[in-house]
Design a protein with these regions (language model features):
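FIC/Doc superfamily catalytic core
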Residues: 1-212
Length: 212
């Protein structure tokens, strides 16, 4: 996704860097998944769970030469705006709370890693990283990459297919955003509703498998 809200530069040069960075991020993603699968804990049926270092490295590789501090959590307030109207549609937690929320995120991911299935894990990651918005910019692409890495790792394979789940998300944004809104609205009530996100991702996964 092309962005025009970078710190270091914008315009055609920034767009070209985004494209180059996307290739680097794919390599980092595949390296991360390969490492997690190969580092399966002894006696465990599950691969190693990714940590904050993996998440931050995916962000760094996606935003290098575009942000002053790629791969580092934000220290300013941000919001999510409607691309057409400019209306604020979501207010992430204050930057002072990001470390707390990220610690909570990885604790919950650790429990879900063994109690849920691969789609449960990916659904939670995709929603929660977007909800926390831990970085100044590039949160969406990092959430998608990390969720896909978790999906592949939890399944124990770098998924084949010409049309990946990540590619499809960018082509079906209304359904993607609707699933995020459903989870956001439930969170306001102190509840969890990741069923729409899981159903959405399952559909994309089936399309990817059919493209082999």
């Amino acid at each position: 996704m092309i962005d025009d809200n970078w710190e270091l530069l914008n315009g055609p040069a920034a767009h070209h860097i985004e494209q180059l960075n996307s290739i680097s991020a794919i390599n980092v993603l595949e390296a991360l998944v390969t490492f997690l699968i190969a580092s399966r804990p002894a006696g465990s049926p599950y691969p190693m769970m990714p940590n904050a270092g993996g998440l931050c490295e995916l962000h760094r590789s996606s935003t290098l030469f575009l942000l002053h501090r790629p791969g580092e959590y934000r220290d300013i307030e941000v919001n999510v705006q409607d691309l057409v109207t400019g209306e604020v549609v979501f207010q992430p937690p204050p930057c002072s709370e990001v470390p707390h929320w990220m610690e909570d995120f990885f604790n919950e991911l650790g429990k879900l890693w063994t109690s849920g299935d691969a789609l449960d894990v990916a659904s939670f990651v995709l929603w929660r990283v977007n909800w926390i918005h831990p970085f100044k910019n590039g949160n969406g692409r990092t959430a998608r990459a990390f969720a896909y890495a978790c999906l592949c790792a939890r399944l124990g394979v770098i998924l084949p297919g010409r049309t990946t789940v990540i590619d499809q998300i960018m082509r079906s944004r209304p359904a993607y955003e609707a699933a995020i809104r459903a989870a956001d609205q439930a969170a306001v009530q102190g509840q969890r509703n990741l069923a729409p996100m899981k159903q959405y991702l399952n559909g994309l996964l089936q399309i990817q498998m059919a493209s082999i």
